[in-house]
Curated annotation (Swiss-Prot):
Pfam families: EF-G_D2, GTP_EFTU, IF-2, IF2_assoc, IF2_N. One of the essential components for the initiation of protein synthesis. Protects formylmethionyl-tRNA from spontaneous hydrolysis and promotes its binding to the 30S ribosomal subunits. Also involved in the hydrolysis of GTP during the formation of the 70S ribosomal complex. This is Translation initiation factor IF-2. GO terms for cellular component: cytosol. Residues 128-228 are annotated as: Disordered. Residues 166-175, 209-219 have a biased composition (Basic residues). InterPro entries: DNA-bd_dom_put_sf, EF-G-like_DII, IF2_assoc_dom_bac, IF2_II, IF2_N, P-loop_NTPase, Small_GTP-bd, T_Tr_GTP-bd_dom. Keywords: Cytoplasm, GTP-binding, Initiation factor, Nucleotide-binding, Protein biosynthesis. Residues 351-355 are annotated as: G2.
Length: 818
């Protein structure tokens, strides 16, 4: 303790300086002034003096006697019966403090609190230690150094002597700080109680692991403690973070328990579970909050190495890729038929295109690749995909129909993709053709023809007679020459999956439009999450080919699964690399799907809490091609409203299986088959369980069916219809009934038990029910126009002359989506 002045010490004790000086003089510390300093010895002298004034002994007692009395009861049986005898055992033990001898221990600077000495108590450990030493031979006790304390037992037993074992390890103890004397508790020693053994040894401790034999009394009581030091400073770790990471994985990387991460997320206001997937930004915030350093990792490196391939070969001129777009039934496929000299439209259900068709045509003007897209509004995604891979867009507009919604949408797709545009005004052979009106409507969509000073070519054609088709091809080739279309011929093939389907005999089939390089039979192809060796290449006429260059569409067989339409296709060197990338994409897709599901669960929970239960129409959809599924799902989901939600539980390419039927049974779903059929097992289950199943070949019919299902679940509307009006002519009281209004029915009829309104000056003053209806003292069910009657209004007695009573009924009106 550092020296302090008398003034500071008085302030600390909250005494006046004069009083402190007088107490110091009484304690024997004289000659001090206010500015003088007090040493620790002087403070101890003052403390001992003050304790003496209060009757406390400063020094600890040299001798302490402990008395103990124990009473027990013994049950004795004799001839007279059982007797209870009280047995009292008295014990007396004296503790004598002997003067310290041998060496002086290294003592630190004493502090005031150490001067306060209470009566020594003996704890359990000390008792056990003393008992063990008492059992030792007297020769050993004589050799050991004498302890400051010796226990003397008044009971006729040998006096136990506590040996100081610490002196046997003086060399180890000299450099250590002095250990505080352990407090001792009162009580009887337990000689048979064993001390708990420590299992970890300090590094360098030679006594660890030795067996203590009964015959040897050599002490091995070195503290067997662990040798490693607990880290004091918090470790800051570099935590690598990918696009997504589970909570448990994040906790492992930070070397903390998952509960700590969950607590941190709760602090952010987000409830998560140990298996929940976090996005990169959220994980970064958590890592920074917990004091570690986030390291953002590009997990797509393996994917980038495969996808980003350079082409060093020469580029060659390639055929233009032309997408034909327009409104439904405007003659897109018929125009392509005339060019191809084939009848594609007749093969489509309903005469409308429901798949993307890719065809390469060699004309007298050169090769052109055509992509025919559906015109129906449900196929927006298909049209957008067609615009993505094309060079020139031909927008077909019927001369007798004009610009329609899908025509406008096609124009928007072409403008968004910044593609060259050619307008084909079709059906010029029809009587009602009006090309000038079509041109005027297109100008309002900012598509101005060249003859009117714009930059868009307009060609008048007829798919039926062939009028203007050559002019259209010339316009397409002119547009492609302006674009200077080139692509490398050698190197790995790159392309886009235009359409995909599951063929019963050939397996997964992907229609691929090659954009660069050459795709050959036997190449390892990677399409999105699917891969495989190309077993066969089939062109648009059904013939097998050995290779396909840029701008050539082919059907690829041999994929591991049905790729998603719109995925990029690329050939890689080895199947191992393709498998690695495909598996990586699948795992990433699965993680994102789980994250979306978790989010949608929370969203649904909050929506249900806010809006109440929403009716659901669950649907299982199976189709022949991937593009049709995409279009139908998009169209069906758009039918959802605030009251009824359309959920596509499952969708896929291929026939309807028993698994689909079981899923429909579990989720109470409707099964729709689009150009596919159910197998025998599925049919048996569907028939036995009464599951809804319908087959369709035209998309309109599916949409209409789902509309009917939604309308059946909509809550009906109720419409109020006024069926009669009566004027109050007189008011009188009737016994047991109350106030009766004498009325004349002026309109319609008045029916008993119908709801009514009471109007005064054309303002509704009461709304209730008609309780009684009488005519000439007789109860009647109804009274028609022009007749008098008495009306009793339920729970209302304020009817006056001149009021009107309006009788109405609620009519249920079935709601529709239109």
């Amino acid at each position: 303790m550092s020296q302090v002045s008398i003034k500071q010490f008085a302030e600390t004790l909250k005494l006046s300086v004069d009083k402190l000086l007088s107490q110091l003089e009484e304690a024997g510390v004289s000659g001090k002034k206010e500015a003088d300093f007090l040493s620790d010895d002087e403070k101890m002298t003052l403390l001992n003096y003050l304790k003496g004034l209060h009757g406390e002994k400063v020094d600890a007692p040299n001798k302490v006697t402990l008395k103990r009395k124990q009473v027990q009861k013994l049950n004795l049986s004799s001839g007279a019966g059982k007797r209870t005898v009280n047995v009292e055992v008295r014990k007396k033990r004296t503790y004598v403090k002997k003067p310290e001898t041998v060496e002086e221990p290294v003592v630190e600077e004493p502090i005031v609190e150490e001067a306060v000495v209470d009566v020594p108590e003996m704890d359990t450990a000390a008792e056990t230690k003393a008992t063990k030493e008492a059992e030792a031979p007297k020769e050993k006790a004589a050799e050991a150094p004498v302890s400051p304390e010796t226990i003397l037992d008044v009971v006729p037993e040998p006096v136990p002597v506590e040996t100081d074992k610490k002196h046997k390890h003086d060399k180890k103890k000299q450099n250590k700080a002095p250990v505080k004397e352990e407090p001792k508790h009162k009580g009887k020693p337990k000689p048979k109680e064993k001390q708990s053994k420590k299992t970890l040894a300090m590094s360098g401790d030679q006594s660890f692991g030795r067996r203590r034999h009964k015959g040897h009394k050599k002490s091995h009581n070195a503290d067997n403690e662990h040798g490693f030091q607990k880290p004091v400073e918090k470790q800051v770790r570099d935590v690598p973070l990918g696009e997504t990471i589970k909570v448990s994985e994040l906790a492992d990387k930070m070397a903390v328990k998952a509960t700590e991460v969950i607590k941190t997320m709760m602090g952010f206001g987000s409830m998560v579970t140990i298996n929940q997937v976090l996005d990169q930004e959220t994980a970064q915030l958590v890592v920074e909050e917990m004091g570690h350093k986030p390291v953002l990792v590009n997990e797509n490196q393996i994917e980038d190495d495969v996808v980003n391939q350079d082409y060093n070969g020469e580029t060659v001129q390639r055929s233009p890729v032309v997408t034909i777009m327009g409104h439904v039934d405007h003659g897109k496929t018929s125009l392509l038929d005339y060019i191809r000299k084939a009848k594609v439209a007749h093969g489509e259900s309903g005469g409308i295109t429901q798949h993307i068709g890719a065809y390469h045509v060699e004309t007298g003007h050169g090769g052109v690749t055509f992509i025919d897209t559906p015109g129906h509004e449900a196929f927006t995604a298909m049209r957008a995909r067609g615009a993505k891979v094309t060079d020139v867009v031909v927008i077909v507009v019927a001369a007798d129909d004009g610009v329609m919604p899908q025509t406008k949408e096609a124009i928007q797709h072409a403008k968004a993709a910044k593609l060259g545009m050619v307008i084909a005004i079709n059906k010029m052979d029809k009587e009602g053709a009006n090309p000038d009106r079509v041109m005027q409507e297109l100008v309002s969509e900012e598509v101005v023809p060249e003859e009117w000073g714009g930059d868009t070519q307009f060609v008048r054609v007829s798919a039926k007679s062939g009028e203007g088709v050559d002019d259209l091809l010339d316009a397409i080739l002119l547009q492609s020459e302006i674009l200077e279309l080139e692509a490398p011929l050698e190197g790995p093939a790159k392309g886009v999956v235009v359409e995909s389907r599951l063929d019963k005999g050939r397996g997964p089939v992907a229609t691929v439009l090659v954009q660069a390089g050459t795709l050959r039979k036997g190449d390892i192809a990677l399409c999105g999450m699917e891969y495989g060796r190309v077993r066969a290449l089939v062109n648009e006429t059904g013939e097998q080919v050995e290779s396909a260059g840029p701008s050539i569409p082919v059907e690829v067989l041999g994929m591991s699964g049905v790729p998603v339409a719109g995925d990029d296709m690329i050939t890689v060197e080895s199947e191992r690399k393709a498998r690695e990338v495909a598996m990586f994409r699948q795992s990433k897709h699965k993680e994102k799907k789980i994250a979306r599901q978790q989010k949608s669960k929370l969203d649904n929970m909050f929506n249900k809490m806010e809006e109440g239960e929403i009716q659901n129409v669950n649907i299982i959809l199976k189709a022949d091609v991937q593009g049709s599924i995409e279009a139908i799902v998009d169209a069906l989901v758009k039918l959802s409203n605030d009251e009824v939600k359309v959920s596509v539980v499952s969708s896929g390419v291929g026939g309807i299986t028993e698994t689909d039927a079981n899923l429909a049974l579990a989720s109470d779903a409707l099964i729709f088959g689009f150009n596919v059929r159910a197998d025998a097992k599925a049919k048996r289950l569907i028939d036995s369980e009464g599951i809804f199943l319908k087959y369709y070949s035209v998309i309109y019919e599916i949409i209409d069916e789902v509309k009917r299902a939604i309308e059946g679940k909509l809550a009906p509307d109720f419409k109020e219809e006024i069926i009669g009006v009566a004027d109050v002519r007189d008011v009188f009281k009737a016994p047991k009934i109350g106030l009766i209004a004498g009325c004349m029915v002026t309109e319609g009829m008045v029916k008993r038990n119908n709801p009514i309104r009471v109007l005064r000056d054309n303002i509704v003053i009461y709304q209730g029910a008609l309780e009684s209806l009488r005519r000439f003292k007789d109860d009647v069910p109804e009274v028609r126009q022009g007749m008098e009657c008495g009306i009793g209004v339920k729970d209302y007695n304020d009817v006056k002359v001149g009021d009107q009573i309006e009788v109405y009924e609620r009519v249920e009106v079935k709601r529709t989506l239109d």
